[in-house]
């Protein structure tokens, strides 16, 4: 695609992003960070941009920042709950389905910059893509304005869903499977990435679950995390049937 087309898309994004942040009641300093946070690898590939200009590094950072923020929230809100309960609650809040709820609620899914092919194949509604962009946005917000502003954002966008019990139907199969295995004294659970295929903008990951030294189930997904969730779901359902 042409430089002019890229410029038009970027300018349109920046205007929409500015409007969105105003609606949410937040300011920002470095628009480039947020543009990167919403740049999917397919968009970068379409315009032959630097491969590190997509949002995966910010997603990595945002994942850690989000876990810290939610951990602090749960630690303060539930002073009498043991570590195990807090871990389970955190897993539910930061899992993919929950992040999709948060992103869609405020329209962040509409901000994602996608390549032409990804857009045509329904990438904008793909849960893993939306949750990744949400984590990348958190990473950008942290770098741009610090942890205090991330906390304020979470108070407005994340914590209300938790306090209104809107995440009760969300299932984090990795946590659910881990707890079941622990209850049954079946040993430790590990995950291995066994296959990664497809073009850079449309990867397909396959992961396996290892229990007691044996691979007991596999799962596929558009991200490594999604493939592990699907593998855990399969393993959990298998063991429940066996019992």
From Swiss-Prot:
One of its GO terms (molecular function) is rRNA binding. Residues 219-243 are annotated as: Disordered. One of its GO terms (biological process) is regulation of gene expression. The gene is rnc. The active site is at residues 63, 135. Keywords: Cytoplasm, Endonuclease, Hydrolase, Magnesium, Metal-binding, mRNA processing, Nuclease, RNA-binding, rRNA processing, rRNA-binding, tRNA processing. The keyword Magnesium applies. Residues 219-231 have a biased composition (Basic and acidic residues). Signal peptide: none annotated. It is found in: Cytoplasm. Belongs to the ribonuclease III family. Its EC number is 3.1.26.3. One of its GO terms (cellular component) is cytosol. This is Ribonuclease 3. The lineage of its organism: Bacteria, Bacillati, Bacillota, Bacilli, Bacillales. It comes from Staphylococcus aureus (strain NCTC 8325 / PS 47). Digests double-stranded RNA. Involved in the processing of primary rRNA transcript to yield the immediate precursors to the large and small rRNAs (23S and 16S). Processes some mRNAs, and tRNAs when they are encoded in the rRNA operon. Processes pre-crRNA and tracrRNA of type II CRISPR loci if present in the organism. Residues 10-146 form the RNase III domain. Its cofactor is Mg(2+). It is an enzyme of class 3 (hydrolase). It catalyses: Endonucleolytic cleavage to 5'-phosphomonoester. Gene3D superfamilies: 3.30.160.20, Ribonuclease III domain (1.10.1520.10). Homodimer. The keyword Coiled coil does not apply.
């Amino acid at each position: 695609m042409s430089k002019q087309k890229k410029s038009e898309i970027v300018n349109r994004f920046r205007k929409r992003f500015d409007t969105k942040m105003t609606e949410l009641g937040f300011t920002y300093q470095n628009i480039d960070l947020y543009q990167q946070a919403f740049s999917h690898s397919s968009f970068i590939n379409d315009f032959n941009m630097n491969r590190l200009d997509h949002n995966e590094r910010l997603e990595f950072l945002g994942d850690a920042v989000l876990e810290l923020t939610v951990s602090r929230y749960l630690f303060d809100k539930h002073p009498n709950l043991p570590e195990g309960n807090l871990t389970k609650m955190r897993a539910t809040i930061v899992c993919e389905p929950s992040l999709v709820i948060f992103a869609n609620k405020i329209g962040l899914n509409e901000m994602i910059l996608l390549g032409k092919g990804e857009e045509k194949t329904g990438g904008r509604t793909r849960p893993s893509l939306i949750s990744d962009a949400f984590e990348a946005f958190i990473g950008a917000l942290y770098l741009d304005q610090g942890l205090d502003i991330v906390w304020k954002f979470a108070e407005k966008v994340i914590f209300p869903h938790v306090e209104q019990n809107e995440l009760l139907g969300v299932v984090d199969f990795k946590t659910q499977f881990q707890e079941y295995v622990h209850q049954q004294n079946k040993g430790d659970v590990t995950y291995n990435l066994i296959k990664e295929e497809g073009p850079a903008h449309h990867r397909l990951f396959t992961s396996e679950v290892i229990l007691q030294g044996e691979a007991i189930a596999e799962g596929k997904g558009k991200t490594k995390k999604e493939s592990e969730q699907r593998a855990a779901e399969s393993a959990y359902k298998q063991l429940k049937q066996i019992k």
